[in-house]
Amino acid sequence: MPIAARVVSFTLPARAGAVPAAILFAPGNEASEAEADAIERSMGAGVSAGRGTIRTRRVPVGSMGALTGYQVAFVTTGLRGEQDNISAVAARSSVLTISSDPACVQAGHCVVGIATSPRVQITVSRAAARAANIRFGSAFLMLVKEI
Protein backbone atom coordinates (compact mmCIF):
# COMPACT_ATOMS: atom_id res chain seq x y z
CA MET A 1 0.00 0.00 0.00
CA PRO A 2 2.87 2.45 -0.39
CA ILE A 3 1.08 3.54 -3.57
CA ALA A 4 -2.04 4.35 -1.55
CA ALA A 5 0.08 6.43 0.83
CA ARG A 6 1.34 8.44 -2.13
CA VAL A 7 -2.24 8.95 -3.32
CA VAL A 8 -3.25 10.28 0.12
CA SER A 9 -0.27 12.65 0.11
CA PHE A 10 -1.68 14.37 -3.00
CA THR A 11 -5.08 15.23 -1.49
CA LEU A 12 -5.96 18.88 -0.95
CA PRO A 13 -5.82 20.29 1.60
CA ALA A 14 -2.79 18.22 2.61
CA ARG A 15 -3.42 15.84 5.48
CA ALA A 16 -1.24 16.22 8.56
CA GLY A 17 -0.84 14.17 11.72
CA ALA A 18 -2.75 10.93 12.15
CA VAL A 19 -4.81 9.93 9.11
CA PRO A 20 -7.31 7.30 10.31
CA ALA A 21 -8.13 4.71 7.64
CA ALA A 22 -10.79 2.01 7.72
CA ILE A 23 -10.12 -1.32 6.02
CA LEU A 24 -13.64 -2.30 4.99
CA PHE A 25 -14.01 -6.07 4.66
CA ALA A 26 -16.66 -8.76 4.65
CA PRO A 27 -16.22 -11.27 7.48
CA GLY A 28 -16.36 -14.80 6.10
CA ASN A 29 -15.40 -13.73 2.58
CA GLU A 30 -11.97 -15.26 1.97
CA ALA A 31 -10.90 -12.79 -0.72
CA SER A 32 -12.00 -9.80 1.34
CA GLU A 33 -10.29 -11.07 4.50
CA ALA A 34 -7.09 -11.91 2.57
CA GLU A 35 -6.92 -8.41 1.11
CA ALA A 36 -7.60 -6.87 4.54
CA ASP A 37 -4.71 -8.97 5.94
CA ALA A 38 -2.42 -7.80 3.13
CA ILE A 39 -3.32 -4.15 3.70
CA GLU A 40 -2.69 -4.49 7.45
CA ARG A 41 0.70 -6.12 6.86
CA SER A 42 1.79 -3.48 4.34
CA MET A 43 0.69 -0.58 6.57
CA GLY A 44 2.11 -1.96 9.81
CA ALA A 45 1.96 0.55 12.66
CA GLY A 46 1.52 3.41 10.20
CA VAL A 47 2.77 4.66 6.85
CA SER A 48 3.85 8.23 6.12
CA ALA A 49 1.72 10.10 3.60
CA GLY A 50 3.23 13.53 3.13
CA ARG A 51 2.90 15.27 6.49
CA GLY A 52 0.45 12.67 7.75
CA THR A 53 0.66 9.08 8.93
CA ILE A 54 -1.97 6.59 7.79
CA ARG A 55 -3.13 4.36 10.63
CA THR A 56 -5.47 1.54 9.68
CA ARG A 57 -8.20 -0.32 11.51
CA ARG A 58 -10.30 -3.21 10.25
CA VAL A 59 -14.00 -2.41 10.02
CA PRO A 60 -16.55 -5.07 9.05
CA VAL A 61 -18.67 -3.61 6.25
CA GLY A 62 -21.84 -4.30 8.24
CA SER A 63 -20.49 -2.19 11.12
CA MET A 64 -19.15 0.76 9.17
CA GLY A 65 -21.87 3.14 10.37
CA ALA A 66 -21.12 6.63 9.07
CA LEU A 67 -17.33 6.10 8.88
CA THR A 68 -17.14 8.89 11.45
CA GLY A 69 -13.56 9.61 12.42
CA TYR A 70 -12.04 8.12 9.27
CA GLN A 71 -10.44 10.09 6.45
CA VAL A 72 -9.67 7.11 4.19
CA ALA A 73 -11.42 3.79 3.55
CA PHE A 74 -9.80 0.84 1.80
CA VAL A 75 -12.58 -1.08 0.04
CA THR A 76 -11.50 -4.71 -0.22
CA THR A 77 -12.34 -7.27 -2.88
CA GLY A 78 -15.66 -9.04 -2.49
CA LEU A 79 -17.74 -6.00 -1.54
CA ARG A 80 -19.41 -5.29 -4.90
CA GLY A 81 -22.85 -5.74 -3.39
CA GLU A 82 -22.01 -3.15 -0.73
CA GLN A 83 -20.21 -0.59 -2.91
CA ASP A 84 -23.26 1.61 -3.48
CA ASN A 85 -23.85 1.90 0.27
CA ILE A 86 -20.12 2.42 0.95
CA SER A 87 -20.08 5.19 -1.65
CA ALA A 88 -23.06 6.98 -0.10
CA VAL A 89 -21.61 6.78 3.41
CA ALA A 90 -18.16 7.90 2.23
CA ALA A 91 -19.64 10.83 0.30
CA ARG A 92 -21.57 12.07 3.36
CA SER A 93 -18.42 11.90 5.51
CA SER A 94 -15.92 13.12 2.86
CA VAL A 95 -13.94 9.88 3.09
CA LEU A 96 -11.41 9.03 0.37
CA THR A 97 -12.21 5.50 -0.86
CA ILE A 98 -9.41 3.40 -2.37
CA SER A 99 -9.86 -0.04 -3.95
CA SER A 100 -8.01 -2.60 -6.01
CA ASP A 101 -11.33 -3.43 -7.72
CA PRO A 102 -11.49 -1.46 -10.99
CA ALA A 103 -15.27 -1.94 -11.17
CA CYS A 104 -15.68 0.10 -7.98
CA VAL A 105 -14.06 3.14 -9.63
CA GLN A 106 -15.71 2.58 -13.02
CA ALA A 107 -19.12 2.56 -11.33
CA GLY A 108 -18.28 5.78 -9.49
CA HIS A 109 -18.45 4.06 -6.08
CA CYS A 110 -14.74 4.46 -5.19
CA VAL A 111 -12.64 7.58 -5.65
CA VAL A 112 -9.36 5.82 -6.44
CA GLY A 113 -8.56 2.45 -7.98
CA ILE A 114 -5.06 1.01 -7.85
CA ALA A 115 -4.03 -1.82 -10.17
CA THR A 116 -0.51 -3.23 -9.88
CA SER A 117 -0.47 -5.81 -12.64
CA PRO A 118 0.80 -5.85 -15.35
CA ARG A 119 1.90 -2.32 -14.37
CA VAL A 120 0.85 0.26 -11.82
CA GLN A 121 -2.27 2.10 -12.95
CA ILE A 122 -4.08 4.62 -10.77
CA THR A 123 -7.60 5.57 -11.81
CA VAL A 124 -9.64 8.40 -10.29
CA SER A 125 -13.42 8.66 -10.56
CA ARG A 126 -14.29 12.33 -10.99
CA ALA A 127 -17.90 11.65 -9.96
CA ALA A 128 -16.95 9.83 -6.74
CA ALA A 129 -14.33 12.46 -5.88
CA ARG A 130 -16.83 15.28 -6.43
CA ALA A 131 -19.51 13.49 -4.38
CA ALA A 132 -17.11 13.01 -1.43
CA ASN A 133 -15.60 16.50 -1.84
CA ILE A 134 -12.12 15.00 -2.38
CA ARG A 135 -9.61 17.11 -4.30
CA PHE A 136 -6.15 16.25 -5.60
CA GLY A 137 -3.19 18.35 -6.64
CA SER A 138 -2.88 19.04 -10.36
CA ALA A 139 0.53 17.31 -10.54
CA PHE A 140 -1.09 14.08 -9.33
CA LEU A 141 -3.98 14.34 -11.78
CA MET A 142 -1.54 14.59 -14.69
CA LEU A 143 -0.09 11.19 -13.70
CA VAL A 144 -3.32 9.22 -13.36
CA LYS A 145 -6.24 8.17 -15.51
CA GLU A 146 -9.42 10.12 -14.75
CA ILE A 147 -12.81 8.72 -15.65
Predicted ranges, named:
Residues 1-147:
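Short hydrophobic alpha-helices and adjacent helix-cap/hinge residues
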